[in-house]
Design a protein with these regions (language model features):
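Flexible "arm" and connector segments at domain edges
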Residues: 1-161
Length: 161
């Protein structure tokens, strides 16, 4: 993906998020308060988890078209999570390149499971525990986001998209 394409995806997603959040809830994704960030990060994490299950089904059913559709859906939710975290476009798409593999399917399913675990980590990072502190470590949440983004790029690369 070129820098121009990344900017387009980021800006279009920002526009869509603000239109949806604005029309339905009177919110701007870049101006959410602490509680709203938590709520929407959890919403987008849950949606991403759902899309990961759909991607797994598409892979198992060898549905090439739907594999691409699900990856695009996942990308939109990941970009939305980055926007909630206050990341600029270049930060949203910045990652460390990962590994290459020869055992395609044996590698894909664990990557999907790892992505689901990272989504759970994101959810846990903003869910308050009754026994813990009542604050969110947003820097840790951004770190988990970077792991998720890196994992997503690896998954898309393995799928040849």
């Amino acid at each position: 993906m070129t820098n121009e394409q990344r900017k387009t995806v980021y800006n279009k997603q920002l526009e869509l998020n603000n239109r949806i959040l604005g029309e339905r809830f009177g919110l701007n994704i870049l101006e959410l308060n602490e509680e709203q960030k938590q709520i929407w990060l959890l919403n987008f994490c849950r949606a991403t988890t759902h899309e990961l299950y759909e991607l797994q089904d598409a892979i198992l059913n060898e549905d090439d078209h739907n594999i691409v559709v699900e990856c695009v859906d996942i990308l939109h939710f990941i970009v939305s999570i980055g926007q909630i975290l206050g990341l600029e476009c270049n930060q949203c798409f910045s990652y460390d390149p990962l590994f290459e593999t020869t055992r395609w399917l044996d590698c894909i399913m664990p990557k999907i499971e790892k992505s689901r675990k990272l989504i759970n980590m994101l959810e846990d990072s903003v869910n308050w525990k009754w026994w813990g502190s009542k604050t969110v470590d947003w820097e840790y949440t951004k770190d988990v986001y970077q792991w998720l983004l890196s994992d997503f790029y690896s998954l898309v690369s393995l799928l040849g998209i």
